[in-house]
A protein has these predicted regions:
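Non-catalytic structural scaffold of enzyme domains
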Residues: 1-207
Length: 207
């Protein structure tokens, strides 16, 4: 993964010369060491979770790779949370798959069933009252998460990342500031998913 991510960053820098690159995924953000001023990682907002938790029990919803990694444990330890805080790492890979397959758009029953199966027992057993959406896919499932767990606060790090971007690049406007979408997978399939979500933008292939 380290080689793939570092090569991709180098490729993007050479091809687009961006002011800033956001690694829009928690798993590589956690697992890959990147020390570049123009690269922003997306990491679990566990300090905020600890701050607002009443029960002292918070969950990190993430991928299996992240759950099993030493890097996530090190990240939790590095944040030096209060002793009253217990952190439960939960494999939400099945929820991520609902988004990657676009099932969250047109298969409500499957989403409801999967959300309950993956999280109900874990949340109940560990008395979770705050959960971080530590896969950037998971915010798309917020309507289902809030429906089944109204007493749990779900934290989406998107606004925090947007604030970091604004702080670094400022509010300057540019003729180049237009959105273009690229994918290294099937552009037609990805574009179809986006269109169902109301995003009418052309998807370009990035080899």
């Amino acid at each position: 993964m380290t080689r793939i991510i570092t090569n991709r960053i180098k490729f993007l820098e050479e091809k687009f010369k961006p002011d800033l690159i956001v690694i829009g995924s928690n798993t590589p953000s956690l697992l890959v060491e990147i020390n570049k001023k123009n690269v922003i990682k997306v990491l679990p907002p566990i300090k905020m979770a600890a701050k607002i938790s009443v029960t002292g029990n918070i969950a990190i919803l993430t991928t299996l790779a992240a759950v099993k990694s030493k890097k996530l444990s090190e990240f939790i330890k590095k944040n030096r949370l209060p002793k009253r805080i217990n952190v439960k790492k939960i494999d939400a890979s099945r929820l991520v798959q609902l988004v990657e397959s676009a099932k969250f758009i047109d298969n409500e029953n499957l989403c409801n069933t999967t959300v309950r199966k993956v999280l109900s027992a874990q949340f109940s057993k560990h008395n979770i009252d705050v959960a971080t959406l530590s896969s950037t896919h998971l915010p798309f499932l917020l309507p289902f998460l809030k429906k089944h767990f109204p007493n749990v606060t779900f934290l989406d790090p998107a606004q925090e990342i947007a604030n970091k971007v604004r702080k670094i690049i400022g509010k300057k406007s540019s003729k180049r500031n237009s959105m273009k979408i690229f994918t290294s997978s099937n552009p037609e399939k990805f574009q179809n998913h986006l269109w169902k979500m109301g995003i009418k933008k052309k998807v370009n292939f990035l080899n």
